[in-house]
Amino acid sequence: MKKLRIGARDSKLSRIQVDIVARKIKQTLGIECEFVPIKTKGDIDKTKSLKDFKSPGVFVKEIELALLSREIDLAVHSLKDLPCEMDSNFEIVAVVEREDPRDVLVSKDGVGFYQLKPNAKIGTSSLRREVHLKNLRQDIQVVNIRGNIETRLSKIESEGLDGVVLAYAALKRLNLDSHVSYIFDVNEITPCPGQGAICIECLKDSPYKNILSKINDADAYIQTQFERLVLKFLGGGCHSSIGVFCKTDQDKIYAFASILSGDKLIKASIEGDKDDFLSLANKLSNMLKS
């Protein structure tokens, strides 16, 4: 079989994620791959806050266009970047790997979150992280920052920040997790749906989707599908304040979610059988609406 062309964002982290997928494809299916880097709108415009982009999928649209034009055979994404309402031409055929989905603080002086000085300035471009940070400490000043992980880390010095909040998974994959000062529990900052997961997206009529599904991690797939369903039922997008975390243990699902309602952060949890994950997701979203 010919080499499979993998389209993904042109960043160091994205290349690492493509390498993870390419290795699994080679080991499991015996097929070679090549990387096709693609610049997305979110990569090009690094000044606008993510919540200010009017259309969803700012990190995926151009990659999906490359799928449609058959310039690439599959796309590799950080699953949290994919809108929960996908275009009918595409589907997620595999969730390949999920790292720790929690958020972390990297602070200037290496101190933990609750040891930060009063009115500390913390950098993030995420509305969800901002809402949760303010819920934990009202004195925190949130500063909007954009850029790749390395750029955001450098802004601690260049912009006089006391710290930045980032995805633990990204730092781990970049071997930068030694910089972590504090790991937020999911009750403190509920992760973005799909955070930490790498997924493969294909056209619905792709001749490769059946073989690529063989590298799917079943537990990671159920966890992330559950999280995305809750987000969908709540009418949220990738850059909303909604956080959802799901873990699986044998035949059970345990989930926790949070949403900003007015000026109050509402939280809810649920557990049940894996087979009932659709109804459980619906129940959890209704608990947050009530």
From Swiss-Prot:
The keyword Transmembrane helix does not apply. It comes from the Bacteria. Keywords: Porphyrin biosynthesis, Transferase. One of its GO terms (molecular function) is hydroxymethylbilane synthase activity. One of its GO terms (cellular component) is cytoplasm. The modification S-(dipyrrolylmethanemethyl)cysteine is found at residue 238. Pathway: Porphyrin-containing compound metabolism; protoporphyrin-IX biosynthesis; coproporphyrinogen-III from 5-aminolevulinate: step 2/4. Monomer. Tetrapolymerization of the monopyrrole PBG into the hydroxymethylbilane pre-uroporphyrinogen in several discrete steps. The porphobilinogen subunits are added to the dipyrromethane group. This is Porphobilinogen deaminase. It comes from Caldicellulosiruptor saccharolyticus (strain ATCC 43494 / DSM 8903 / Tp8T 6331). The gene is hemC.
